[in-house]
């Protein structure tokens, strides 16, 4: 998870957001560890105090100093895969471009490298061929759902939108080939 800090993502609502995220963390820390990305050391200290005050099990929280652009890691975070034969884990590190909507996403693109290094899991950068040069594929984790048995559920609007185009020139067949290769 990432601790909320970008007030522009929640116009007029930001003051309520830390409390909502805090409640989620409180529920989670009753049963499991939470890895929490926080902007800087000062914010880590303030966040720790706040979470302790609302009853979170602080011993189940691992704080990571890492600046992010927004808190929604479902889309910007890593995709974990497990090889069914040898149980080896890998991370698919897609490029994230904030839904082709916002200009601030560079920090979010550092999340997967941090997680890969912290967990000591190999990271793969899915690439596409475009104009005779290799480019990373832009993808949000929330754009698809995979059952681990060769079936995948995709969001056409997300992947093939001309208004918020993720991968210029990509067609349906390109995404089919991409998922066939990496998933």
Task: Identify the meaning behind each predicted range.
Residues 2-183:
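The feature marks the mature, well-folded catalytic cores of soluble enzymes
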